[in-house]
Amino acid sequence: MSELQSQPKKIAVVTGASGGIGYEVTKELARNGYLVYACARRLEPMAQLAIQFGNDSIKPYKLDISKPEEIVTFSGFLRANLPDGKLDLLYNNAGQSCTFPALDATDAAVEQCFKVNVFGHINMCRELSEFLIKAKGTIVFTGSLAGVVSFPFGSIYSASKAAIHQYARGLHLEMKPFNVRVINAITGGVATDIADKRPLPETSIYNFPEGREAFNSRKTMAKDNKPMPADAYAKQLVKDILSTSDPVDVYRGTFANIMRFVMIFVPYWLLEKGLSKKFKLDKVNNALKSKQKNKDD
């Protein structure tokens, strides 16, 4: 008998469970009677959760979703241990920030961003699909407002989130015949530690006072806009998971619903003008014009 065959609880897999949203959703699922495989590259934070909630509610598993071979190994582990081969929930939450001017993002930075934010989630869905179909389960993605609005200095991250939004929407259609729900949680401001700590490259075309000021305003965007506490976000999302409704997109987090309507009713040129002012790109523009004028004089 496998380790879980006597376990009547619903079973979930959560990636990126070592902090922020994934950590809080893991706890909220455990409170709602799930056994959660809490997956992340770092086991230490999740080990504390296993102690707090008990090993019959949270089981830490070391997993780097940017490595396809680790996902295949994890799938084999689940095949050997899931009761009746059923997985009730896959929460694709692991994420990689990438905050750079578009022209400064290196091949390595772009590749890592897409490996985690896109390819890793696609691989998880493919490798775990048989368990989810058997359970008539639910697949959830942590989407982002950045996948709807391309904020300055975040074009690579925005591209990765836009890609996973479209994947989720296609998957939502394709999984309906198999009675598997797919939820894309388009996420606004949430208090997490995902913010990119890497500095502006010295060779950047934005490496002058006004450019650095604009870049720094983008890096502090989340904490400057009253982000929703991660535990409050988790409670909302778990309600969505437990619901029987089947929308593909749900909007959660600070400003998420506001931006949803902004994108419908506000012309993009006007939104772009607002973003330019908010992130101080108007100052960059003025500084460059002044510099050019001085050259011409």
From Swiss-Prot:
Compartment list: Lipid droplet; Mitochondrion outer membrane; Endoplasmic reticulum
**The protein's Enzyme Commission number:** 1.1.1.101, 3.1.1.3
Q: Which UniProt keywords apply?
A: Endoplasmic reticulum, Hydrolase, Lipid degradation, Lipid droplet, Lipid metabolism, Membrane, Mitochondrion, Mitochondrion outer membrane, NADP, Oxidoreductase
* Reported induction: Expressed during vegetative growth with a maximum level of transcription at G1 phase, after which it is decreased during the remainder of the cell cycle.
Q: Which reaction does it catalyse?
A: a 1-acylglycerone 3-phosphate + NADPH + H(+) = a 1-acyl-sn-glycero-3-phosphate + NADP(+); 1-hexadecanoyl-sn-glycero-3-phosphate + NADP(+) = 1-hexadecanoylglycerone 3-phosphate + NADPH + H(+); a triacylglycerol + H2O = a diacylglycerol + a fatty acid + H(+); 1,2,3-tri-(9Z-octadecenoyl)-glycerol + H2O = di-(9Z)-octadecenoylglycerol + (9Z)-octadecenoate + H(+)
What does the UniProt record report as the effect of altering residue 18 to A in this chain?
Answer: Completely abolishes lipase activity
The source organism is: Saccharomyces cerevisiae (strain ATCC 204508 / S288c) (Baker's yeast)
Locate the active site: 18 (nucleophile), 157 (proton acceptor), 161 (lowers pka of active site tyr)
The record places the motif (GXSXG) at: 16-20
Give the GO cellular component terms, alphabetically.
Answer: cytoplasm; endoplasmic reticulum; lipid droplet; mitochondrial outer membrane; mitochondrion
User: Other notes on this protein?
Assistant: Present with 3671 molecules/cell in log phase SD medium.
**Which residues bind NADP(+) per the record?**
21, 64, 93, 126, 157, 161, 190, 192
**Which family does the UniProt entry place this protein in?**
Belongs to the short-chain dehydrogenases/reductases (SDR) family.
PANTHER family, sorted: NADPH-DEPENDENT 1-ACYLDIHYDROXYACETONE PHOSPHATE REDUCTASE
What switches its activity on or off, per the activity regulation note?
A: Inhibited by divalent cations and N-ethylmaleimide. Activity is reduced under anaerobic growth conditions.
Record function comment: Can convert acyl and alkyl dihydroxyacetone-phosphate (DHAP) into glycerolipids and ether lipids, respectively. Required for the biosynthesis of phosphatidic acid via the DHAP pathway, where it reduces 1-acyl DHAP to lysophosphatidic acid (LPA). Also has triacylglycerol (TAG) lipase activity. Involved in the mobilization of the non-polar storage lipids triacylglycerols (TAGs) from lipid particles by hydrolysis of TAGs. Required for spore germination. Plays a role in cell wall biogenesis, but this effect may be indirect by affecting the activities of cell wall synthesis enzymes.
InterPro entries referenced in this protein's UniProt entry, alphabetically:
NAD(P)-bd_dom_sf, Sc_DH/Rdtase_CS, SDR_fam
Cite the GO molecular-function annotations of the record: acylglycerone-phosphate reductase (NADP+) activity; triacylglycerol lipase activity
- Temperature dependence, free-text field: Optimum temperature is 40 degrees Celsius. Thermostable for 10 minutes up to 45 degrees Celsius.
Show the PROSITE patterns listed in the entry: ADH_SHORT
Which protein, by its recorded name, is this? NADPH-dependent 1-acyldihydroxyacetone phosphate reductase
